[in-house]
UniProtKB/Swiss-Prot annotation:
It comes from Dichelobacter nodosus. Gene3D superfamilies: Glycoprotein, Type 4 Pilin. This is Type IV major fimbrial protein FimA. Disulfide bonds join 57-67, 140-153. Keywords: Disulfide bond, Fimbrium, Membrane, Methylation, Transmembrane, Transmembrane helix. The keyword Membrane applies. The lineage of its organism: Bacteria, Pseudomonadati, Pseudomonadota, Gammaproteobacteria, Cardiobacteriales. The chain crosses the membrane at residues 8-28. It is a single-pass membrane protein.
């Protein structure tokens, strides 16, 4: 009488475990890169929304203290709130955000976001900066590695 094999042998199970290990070794770093890229894109979008409020305030002739930015805090930013260095800062109440408020329509300004402890390890403590030219155009620049930079945000 022949006995029928039921189940898997130890060798077959070890091969499956090895294959899963190889796939995990490839997938986990790629997933971490994806997370870092998505976090940079998220902060770019969140801080980019402040441009409209700042531009509206500047064109309406409001000072930084009179202007409500309407910022929703981000858990990806960290650090102490720092006032802008060359002109009055618009208070966002968010640590990790620095705003150099343009005092006139033909003045320069910027929004600087510093990635904090909740951000992916590959992007902290890097920065993302929106800069306003004297002509009123905004450009994005960042200090994160090129592989994490979203479209429209170049090296700083």
């Amino acid at each position: 009488m022949k006995s029928l094999q039921k189940g898997f042998t130890l060798i077959e199970l070890m091969i499956v475990v090895a294959i899963i290990g190889i796939l995990a070794a490839i997938a986990i770093p790629q997933y971490q890169n994806y997370i870092a890229r998505s976090q940079v894109s998220r902060v770019m979008s969140e801080t980019g929304q402040m441009r409209t409020a700042i531009e509206t305030c500047v064109l309406d002739g409001k000072e930084a203290g009179e202007c409500f930015i309407g910022w929703t805090g981000s858990n990806l930013l960290d650090g102490d709130f720092t006032a802008g260095t060359e002109s009055t800062a618009a208070a966002t109440g968010q640590a990790g955000i620095t705003i150099k408020y343009p005092v006139a329509a033909d003045d320069e300004g910027n929004i600087v976001a510093t990635f904090g402890r909740n951000a992916a390890a590959a992007i902290k403590p890097q920065t993302l900066t929106w800069s306003r030219s004297k002509e009123g155009t905004w450009t994005c620049a960042t200090t994160v590695e090129a592989k994490f930079q979203p479209t429209g945000c170049k090296d700083k």
